[in-house]
């Protein structure tokens, strides 16, 4: 099975990391599964610091589509064209899109037009404000998806109310927690990095707000 995970912005990598690790773990157990990470943007995207992938303990994207535009409709068209080219060169069985960006909506449309199995991570999220571009993206992606991975009961309820069958809905929980747990042992408390004498700090804070001549 060949899986393609599509992300469109920096925050999406935090949610994609647990999926990448799950694919790697399955391969180590002997399962025939391959996973590729596709980023809609450029390799030198300024919003992505060099340490991000090391911090998340995940590999860098396998492919950068290089799509970028301030116009969301133009960006959608660019991603559709570039993702189509990617799929022409990379046999894919399942496409997993993360979140609700224009780029992930574009990838969803291409995947379904090619008859691929489509899964949406963080499905069922709604603002109920159709004037928001992301709300349009959510409706399109969820409507096209074969599998809806929701974060909680509210997501399940939304998907059901909009006509999704129970066989499509999987409540996977808040996947950000998976990343948090995975990195828990590596976390350092601020107090361990910058020692602070709490009593003196508290005294200085109090003295800064006391009237002159007031004895503390």
Tell where the protein language model's regions lie, with residue ranges.
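Conserved hydrophobic helix-helix packing surfaces used for dimerization/oligomerization
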Residues: 3-5, 35, 95, 198-200, ...
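N-terminal beta-loop-helix "entrance" segment that forms/cooperates
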Residues: 42-59
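A nucleotide-sugar donor-handling region in carbohydrate enzymes
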Residues: 42-43, 47, 66, 144-216
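Hydrophobic anchor at the start of a short beta-strand
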Residues: 30, 35, 118, 169
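Short internal beta-strands
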Residues: 35-42
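Short N-terminal binding/cap micro-motifs at the start of the first secondary-structure element
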Residues: 12-16, 45-47
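Active-site and donor-binding regions of nucleotide-sugar-utilizing enzymes
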Residues: 4-6, 14-22, 28, 52, ...
């Amino acid at each position: 099975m060949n899986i393609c995970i599509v992300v469109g912005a920096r925050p999406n990598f935090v949610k994609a990391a647990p999926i990448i690790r799950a694919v790697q773990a399955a391969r180590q157990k002997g399962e025939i599964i391959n996973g590729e990470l596709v980023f809609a943007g450029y390799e030198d995207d300024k919003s992505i610091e060099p340490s991000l992938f090391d911090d998340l303990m995940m590999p860098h994207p396998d492919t950068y589509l290089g799509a970028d535009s301030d116009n969301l409709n133009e960006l959608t068209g660019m991603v559709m064209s570039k993702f189509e080219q990617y799929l022409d060169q990379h046999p894919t069985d399942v496409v997993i899109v993360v979140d609700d960006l224009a780029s992930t909506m574009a990838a969803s449309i291409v995947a379904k037009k090619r008859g691929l199995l489509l899964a949406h991570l963080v499905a069922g999220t709604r603002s109920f404000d159709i004037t928001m571009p992301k709300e349009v993206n959510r409706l399109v992606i969820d409507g096209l998806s074969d599998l809806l991975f929701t974060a909680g009961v509210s997501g399940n309820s939304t998907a059901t109310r909009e006509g999704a069958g129970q066989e499509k809905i999987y409540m996977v929980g808040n996947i950000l927690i998976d990343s948090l747990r995975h990195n828990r042992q590596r976390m350092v408390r601020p107090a361990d990095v910058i020692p602070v004498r709490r009593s003196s700090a508290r005294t200085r804070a109090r003295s800064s707000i006391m009237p002159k001549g007031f004895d503390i």
